[in-house]
Amino acid sequence: MKNNYTSLKSPLDEEDELKTDHEIDLEKGLLPEYNSEEEGALPPYSDISKLAKTVPEDSSTGPTETANPNVERRQGFKDSHPNIYSLLRLLISVLAVSVVFFTAWVCVNPLEKSIFGKVAFSVTIGITCPILFIAIFCFFETWTQAVAQCIKVTAIFLAQCVKACGKGIKHFLKKWENMPMAFSEVFLFNILVGSPRMNLRYIFGDRWGLKCSLAEHITFVVLSILVFIAETVKPGSIRVNLIRKMGYEAKQQVNEYTAVPLREMNPESEA
């Protein structure tokens, strides 16, 4: 049976195919194997694959930026309700100026001052309040964003503090068996330190300014709490440190009193 197949290609076409089969594109490298069974697969280096991979970009708009939802919400409210937004700015500005004015009035009380004091107060308030009103009204969006950012940072900081305190309390509660001893030590601390403190306050209170002092009570309460926490977490830490400190100071005093001068030990050194 004879093969009647006749090639329709000219000898020049066959020669070009042989050349292109053996030539390698230095930029693209070797051609990868093409698997026609894969869905959506395209021949390598084909124009169709280039068109499929190309993503159209809008040169007029440029890259899109991630907008802040709070800014968009504020801008939308400003565009939809311009009168209410302006009234809100005016109300907040007047409220802030009023707070500053009445605070300064209560603190300074210009009615009890001399004429010079009244004039100085009037000039200061007359300059400060308009400047404050203009700054708050004109830069309303700027300082509101700054205040919101400060509130956000403060909230994050407080959340971290609460988390750290929770871990500390959890570790503290693990030492619950030390709490009765720590409480008794705090009670003893209040007896030993509280009685002399009360006597000194009643005797020398007018001279030292210790009578009915709020700072004194707060300091004493804080010290008691610190003693309770330290003795609960590490029992005996305060007692050991206090005894060591007292022993070290007593040893230094003994060394100072019993030290023999160098001249008395070596009288020949004077000659």
Swiss-Prot record:
Sorted alphabetically, the Gene Ontology cellular component annotations on this record are:
cytoplasm; vacuolar membrane
Specify the domain of life of the species encoding this protein.
Eukaryota
Q: Which gene encodes it?
A: wtf35
Where is coiled-coil annotated?
Answer: none
What residue spans carry the Polar residues bias annotation? 57-69
Q: Predominant location of this chain?
A: membrane
Q: Which GO terms describe its biological process?
A: meiotic drive
Residue ranges for the region (Disordered) are 1-24, 54-75
Transmembrane region positions? 90-110, 120-140, 176-196, 213-233
Name of the protein in question: Meiotic drive suppressor wtf35
Function per UniProt: Acts as a suppressor component of the dual wtf meiotic drive system, and can suppress but not confer meiotic drive by compatible poisons. Wtf meiotic drive systems promote unequal transmission of alleles from the parental zygote to progeny spores by encoding a poison and an antidote from the same locus; the poison is trans-acting and forms toxic aggregates in all spores within an ascus, wherease the antidote is spore-specific and targets aggregates for degradation by the vacuole.
Q: Which organism is it from?
A: Schizosaccharomyces kambucha
Binding partners and assembly: Homomer. Interacts with other proteins that exhibit high sequence similarity.
Q: Is Transmembrane among the key words of this record?
A: yes
